[in-house]
Amino acid sequence: MEAMWLLCVALAVLAWGFLWVWDSSERMKSREQGGRLGAESRTLLVIAHPDDEAMFFAPTVLGLARLRHWVYLLCFSAGNYYNQGETRKKELLQSCDVLGIPLSSVMIIDNRDFPDDPGMQWDTEHVARVLLQHIEVNGINLVVTFDAGGVSGHSNHIALYAAVRALHSEGKLPKGCSVLTLQSVNVLRKYISLLDLPLSLLHTQDVLFVLNSKEVAQAKKAMSCHRSQLLWFRRLYIIFSRYMRINSLSFL
């Protein structure tokens, strides 16, 4: 028991040490800067519901801003599972404004083809057609979305991955268009916040974004825009989830 306690303390000290290094510079020098992720790209963030952009992808959005990416956002539903669609669309726009995504670059799909419902399977080909249209119209050269695990396992998240995976494997994406997927982690790693940083550094192969303290506050402010969703367990999520601080992503 004592050994476990000492291990937790050591991990905490190590993690906060890493954070100090990131906070000490004006701009974090992340792995993506020396890898395959260039500057000034036109990036499309593809999400399933309003609040995905803040709950899961805030480190990516803010990290891309450091690299001067022009970020577009495509949300495949209005989040109307509890008949709150109109409210949630407004909350999404407020959150995007906090994260620095131009409102003119935000597209929300609100139709019966893509219901906010974990029990409904979205048609992969239909999702892929809509996605490809937005990629081509906006001249996108980087697509960011969920991986096969969908982070939370939500079927709508996984449907987005299936669609972009199909476009990629079938060679339908425009030349020079890459795909990044957000790594799903186990429940323990998901809820240890910054303590996951050493593991993220060890296991991330392609792109790693880690927020400094100022950026974490910005991410939390974006999440707080989704007032209709701030139930007690989501407030705990904001405090403990690694996804409010850390995003590790892989190229297809």
From Swiss-Prot:
This is N-acetylglucosaminyl-phosphatidylinositol de-N-acetylase. InterPro entries: GlcNAc_PI_deacetylase-related, LmbE-like_dom_sf. It is found in: Endoplasmic reticulum membrane. The chain crosses the membrane at residues 2-22. Keywords: Deafness, Disease variant, Endoplasmic reticulum, GPI-anchor biosynthesis, Hydrolase, Ichthyosis, Intellectual disability, Lipid metabolism, Membrane, Transmembrane, Transmembrane helix. It comes from Homo sapiens. GO terms for biological process: GPI anchor biosynthetic process. Retained in the ER by two retention signals, one located in cytoplasmic domain, and a second signal in transmembrane domain that is functional in the presence of membrane proximal residues of the cytoplasmic tail. Its EC number is 3.5.1.89. Residues 23-252 are cytoplasmic. One of its GO terms (molecular function) is N-acetylglucosaminylphosphatidylinositol deacetylase activity. It comes from the Eukaryota. It catalyses: a 6-(N-acetyl-alpha-D-glucosaminyl)-1-(1,2-diacyl-sn-glycero-3-phospho)-1D-myo-inositol + H2O = a 6-(alpha-D-glucosaminyl)-1-(1,2-diacyl-sn-glycero-3-phospho)-1D-myo-inositol + acetate. Pfam families: PIG-L. Catalyzes the second step of glycosylphosphatidylinositol (GPI) biosynthesis, which is the de-N-acetylation of N-acetylglucosaminyl-phosphatidylinositol.
